[in-house]
Amino acid sequence: VNTSVPSLARRLDSVRSSAIRDLLALTARDDVISLAGGLPDTDLIPVQRIRRAAEDVLAQSSSVQYGETSGWRALRAVLAQRESRLLQRTIAATEVVITHGSQQALTLVAQALLDPGAIVVVDEPAYTGALQVFSIADADIRPIPITADGMDTDELARRLGAGLRPTLVHTVSNFHNPRGVTMSTSRRRHLAALAEQYGFWILEDDPYGEIWFDTPPPPPIASYSDRVVRLSSASKILAPALRVGWLVAPEPVCKAVELLKQGADLCGSTLTQQMATQMLADSVWLDAHLNTVRAEYGNRARALCHEFVDAFGDRAQLSSADGGMFVWMTFGDGTDTTALLPRALDHGVAFVPGRAFADNALHASSARLCFASSPTPALAEAVRRLRAAHALER
């Protein structure tokens, strides 16, 4: 019997496994406090409300049938209303497509808009899931540095003036993954104006926009241009296992995505989409739930930053923690975080090294820390362990 493995498609040659997904397998030990994953806290997932929604939906036998490729109509209507309020312009339900998490939306948009070799501009450092998608699409990925107020649109403008012609610009506009920063209003306006001037699409990835601590973020980039595809998700505000994400885009893009989705999965889960509809439409409950999540994550973010300053002083810098799930840490003494990670794991703490998000030595001394998944006492212990590991590494 011939047991040799058949050759795989060449498109996989340039695709790397997500360092974060690989790291999660290493950190699944009970003795490790993980600051590595981007997981919401299980204790803050509204399990009882999800159970009630499931019971209500399952009372109708039709809830377990196939559905429309573009998603459950009532959910699209609810999301269109929410987006209309955010963007301060009318969004129709036909401009919304429901996907199997926002990662599928990212994949389908890349398939719809990118030919092989198309230029895609990304943040540096960048969301690793986006880098994977664009690599699979055989895109020519061009990083633009991210600053304290988002993508450096001045640098982007300079490169555009020098002849760069991207098809797509991807950015995480609110509480960036991994940098933790939020794009300023002026940067948003500038990026939108550049898209209009040079004719590229903006992919505004926004899974964290609802998780603000003190003040909401500025209006979305899509408020200033219709050359924007917005992505978001119920994973961070309701539950990852629902696998409900969505995109908001002009109808021609939505129709192209729907066509591709037909071939990908026919349709999503009508069961979980109906459950999500019920919860997202219940504005009184949802506002109270989001306020609980914001308050708890805000407390954790402040606690992590406080413990970090106490432990490391001016030997390390942290990004601001105004929302989302992450802070970006940089050692001032040149510590290589990739080399530090094995020692940190020996001490029972995990993080994601900066080089996982950018192939650039500038980020070798940085790391992404997630404060959302662990209660405050565990965060304090995680910093203590990290300090001990760092002391031995020096």
What are these regions (language model features)?
Residues 59-198, 209-229, 297, 377, ...:
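Conserved core of the PLP fold type I
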Residues 205:
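Glycine-centered flexible beta-alpha turn that most often forms the glycine-rich phosphate-binding loop
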Residues 229-294:
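Conserved core segment of the aminotransferase class I/II
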Residues 248, 328-330, 370-372:
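Short hydrophobic/aromatic beta-strand micro-patches
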Residues 294-305, 317-330:
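Conserved glycine-rich beta-strand-loop-beta hairpin in the small C-terminal domain of fold type I
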Residues 335-340, 377-381:
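Short, conserved charged micro-motifs
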Residues 346, 360-394:
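PLP-dependent enzyme catalytic core of the Aspartate aminotransferase-like
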